[in-house]
C-alpha cells in the first residue's frame, strides 16, 4: 500500500494525555495514557521515538531509511503504524 504525498506530509504528534517513554520496569518503550500503558515492540518504539510534533511522516521515513537502508518495506511499515495509532487515538495527524 502506497500513500500519496499529502498523507506523508502530515505531522504526527502524541494525542493529549499520551506520552512515549522508556519504562525500565518493562525493559521497553511504552506509551503511557490516563487509563494505562501500552508496551511497544522494537519497530514501533523506533517509529514512536521519532514522533515529536515537528517531523512529518516523510521525515520520519527518511530518518529510518538512513539507519536501515536495506529495508524496502520501511515506508509501508511507518504508514501502517501511523494509520493504526491514529485509529486508536494515540496520535493526531496535523
Curated annotation (Swiss-Prot):
Domain of life: Bacteria
Keyword terms, alphabetized: PQQ biosynthesis
Coiled coil: none
UniProt keyword Secreted present: no
Single GO MF descriptor: quinone binding
Keyword Phosphoprotein recorded: no
Family: Belongs to the PqqD family.
Name recorded for this polypeptide: PqqA binding protein
Natural source organism: Pseudomonas savastanoi pv. phaseolicola (strain 1448A / Race 6)
Amino acid at each position: 500500500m502506497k500513500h500519496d504525498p499529502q498523507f506523508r506530509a502530515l505531522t504526527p504528534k502524541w494525542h493529549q494525555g499520551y506520552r512515549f517513554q522508556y519504562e525500565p520496569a518493562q525493559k521497553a518503550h511504552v506509551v503511557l495514557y490516563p487509563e494505562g500503558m501500552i508496551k511497544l515492540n522494537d519497530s514501533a518504539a523506533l517509529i514512536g521515538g521519532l514522533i515529536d510534533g515537528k517531523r512529518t511522516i516523510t521525515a520520519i521515513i527518511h530518518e529510518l531509511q538512513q539507519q536501515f537502508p536495506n529495508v524496502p518495506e520501511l515506508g509501508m511499515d511507518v504508514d501502517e503504524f501511523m494509520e493504526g495509532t491514529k485509529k486508536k487515538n494515540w496520535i493526531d495527524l496535523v
